[in-house]
């Protein structure tokens, strides 16, 4: 179809792109009952792994977007991350064998297609309109809506692109989640900041056929990711991908033509020469050229159009935060769009999306860029100096996970609780006969949680009505039932003890908006949120 949009072509949100960012946004927004239209250039989900790992915060986002058990059915905790020299000597060893505050392992080794299938199923079940095989051509924002024009796209038997109908849809808001070559970003002529380090992997994904032998002192079956530096050769790495899959990477020229290497013969020669593996050990099913670099869009919003995920930022893979950052974009923008679309918040809160997310992403781009440049040193003397420093314990600090210092949070003055702006916990709770992770028991959204008291008793009618309008769960958590949810694994007791607070008000992206030192301060926290939302 073409021409003026009909009633069936008008939506609350149009999402360009249906990778992890678009999938998460489509699921979260449709869960809230909004009319969502997805336009994706490829005819189906990609179906192959790209992300190798996510952190516990991202796992909680996926939990909000779909059935987490289905999403992680082939995943395992990632135990360690090692940087080694070409002799196999450890330079950097990051232990990851503990739990994340969000209720999942600190890092998860995953099979990405499972996650995408689960989010796709949720989005469709919740009524999102998913249009695969439609490539966005242009985006035209106006004061009251944005129009998106797309064209039907398919690949013929001759492997050439075939174009079909043109369609124009109209939405109150548009999310450009269409990747590094974003048509939305290009349509709006948004530029990008460039980081200095660039390189590439030749990636070979495989299924393990049997227990693998130790490789340079590391067991590939132990959920340990290892990068081997090679100043006189080519760096390489082995990365577990959940229960059955594994990725082998080999350094490549990011500007070179590697078509002669993306095949079975080259891949197995590489595995035999470097790792001593053969077809008896693994079955390779994917051959890919993966260039990487750091880039950041100069703006993430023009009027009613937003960028998210790889359309807004790229980073090298060495901190495993590219996909995590994309999922954070999706949930941050989704909960704010939800409130604006439902009329429970002022549109001005959308300005906080870029203000909150951009500095957060920059930390990870900087950190992964620095780690990659260090791992790929090609000067032999510089590599020897690096090795000596690392083996002597003179290791540059890995960036700590950033937290919010401004945006939609209570004042972070000296008197304010330190928990503000940090991630809130998710523990196991029991309500009646139901026991599970907090979000599974109570649902996704705002959370007002009191320690050993029900926060509802401290609120007046207006405050309670406001929390109901924004879909906030209000619950007390304690050691015994007595009208409260039971803190089954002690997570909340430990959290409240460590932070010295009696209540926390948590945003839908699991960031602590505000906290109260004592129950009597709880109403002030609620009023502050109401003021900031303009509700």
Question: What are the language-model segments listed below?
Answer:
Residues 1-12, 16, 31-32, 85-88, ...:
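Helical substrate-recognition/capping region of FAD-dependent monooxygenase/halogenase enzymes
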Residues 9-11, 161-173:
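Core beta-strand elements of the Rossmann-like FAD/NAD(P) dinucleotide-binding domain
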Residues 22-23:
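N-terminal Rossmann-fold NAD(P) dinucleotide-binding loop
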Residues 30-50:
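Glycine-rich FAD pyrophosphate-binding loop
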Residues 48-122, 230:
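Active-site-adjacent segment of FAD-dependent monooxygenases/related oxidoreductases
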Residues 74, 260-322, 360, 364-367:
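FAD/FMN-dependent oxidoreductases across multiple families
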Residues 132-147, 151-155:
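A conserved short coil-to-beta-strand element within the FAD-binding core of flavoproteins
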Residues 156-160, 173-292:
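Conserved FAD-binding catalytic core of PHBH/FMO-like flavoproteins
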